[in-house]
Amino acid sequence: LVVIGVIAALAVLVLLFFRAPKVDHKIKYGRNIVAIVLIWVIGMGAINLGIASGLINKKFGNLRDSYFKYGFAYCFTNSVLNTGIQKPKNYSASSIKKIVDEEESQATEATEKTPNIIFLQLESFFDLNNMTNIKLSDNPVPNFEKIYNEYPSGYLTVPVVGAGTVNTEFEIMTGMNLDDFGSGELPFKTVLTNHTSESICYNLKEYGYKCHAIHNNTATFYGRNKVFSNLGYDTFSSIETMNITEFTPTGWAKDKFLKDEILDTLDLTTEQDFIYAISVQGHGAYSVDDSYESKIKVTGLDDESLTREYEYYADQTREMDKFIGSLVKALKKRKEETILVMYGDHLPSLGITAENLKNKNVYQTQYVIWSNFDNDYYKNKKVKAYQLESRILKPLKMTAGVINNYTQFHRKDSDYKENLKNLAYDMLYGDNYASGEENPYVATDLQLGIHPARLTNIQQVYEDDVIDGFFYGENFNTYSKVYINDEEMETDFIDNNTLMVRDCNIKYGDKVVVCQQDADGVILTQTDEFTYSEDEIKPPNYTPPETKKAKATKKSKKSKKSKKNKEAETTSK
């Protein structure tokens, strides 16, 4: 979009050069150049002075607030020009070798205990009981509070407020500090679109894990369908592969459907599993109309509209909490040892300020480490998002990965952050000195969904000179669309095994596929190509659902038959 905008701006300038009125006096180029230079120097000087004095921030944890505070020109320019990690002054083969040598001296063998590991990232999840300026008619998160108080837990420092989920995601998955990147940058939209990176997935693969991502929102949001391949995931189950039937009043999928997705994924493999589940129910905005009836009442706010937003949000966290309780209950019953790490990705966009929080920090959410087996691996403590992976893996003696290893053993060193920046630069923008000058991470062949759709059979039903096509297979849902000879058909979802295309005259030799595509029509995956032939028959013992037209026709025929019978009876009498 930035490139398109720049091209459009240049095109307009060129057009104006030729079409705009010409001045009738001599232009004083020297004076104008001096003025431009002075404006540039004064402007940059003022910005640098503001940054040095702390009046202007180079980092945008809250993009919306930053644009309001510092203005569009500064924020937009900074976001466009300041991307990636600036090359550290001391970056060299020898400096990286020194860091790597330090970490290798700390490497240990992995323990025999390799539990399933689940990271549950809860969208905008926050315990409203931690606010000092409001009162609630009921506790919206009793399950979370109980687990939080009984298991290792603490505050999680995240890089964003109110939005920017993928930046918390990025730090947790890679172990890299977002402060080292450009202002407001989303690495999911920049470097990770075409570059692999060390991640918790690649690190756990060293111990035999299969790695899965689950998200009850569209796969293309933040480009996850591309990025997750570069982060080492084997499967990615998005809303386009799920059968979600309930949504919030603002249109987000409810989180309770994640439970079965998580359990099914654990059942899928014989290996140990790592699952990164990303919820969406708590997503903003929280504006609802006056007809919304809240279950939890909020008092203490002067603004009626804001109060309604808080009440709506409280209701959503209440439902998310029920999902947490049901998931924990289900995991307790499983024989496989499992660690479940739960946390909010950032505070909700409700205008929350530090002074109204018990912990006085808008960049902190809460996390808890639950497990279904006895262990003493973890203690209550605060942790930064980019150190969470190492906090979970260190007690398990899983030291694979340059960044993971370095954080495990050097996070308290005085030069830790600088060396971490060096390692991240080396891996994403440098010469890969840490890994023998080669990128060791190969992008995975990411499978969309754990149960891909499959087309097995086609049947045509003739009805009143109209031919309806029935397409049979497995794992269909409302995002499944029939394509015939590369042309999308208007598709009706009947059930998980059946799709229907009305008025569809398929000819012998036609090529048919079923595609899973998002709401914008982006094709995410498709079945193997199916060539229609005379041998195709309907599945045994299967009666296709009646269409409304068929039912109406039957009713009409039945009515006519009944009328004829009555006429016959009258005549006989």
Regions from the PLM with identified roles:
Residues 101-112, 122, 127-573:
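Solvent-exposed soluble domains appended to multi-pass membrane proteins
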Residues 117-121:
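Long, solvent-exposed extracytoplasmic domains/loops
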Residues 1-115, 136-155, 190-194, 198, ...:
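N-terminal secretory/membrane-targeting segments
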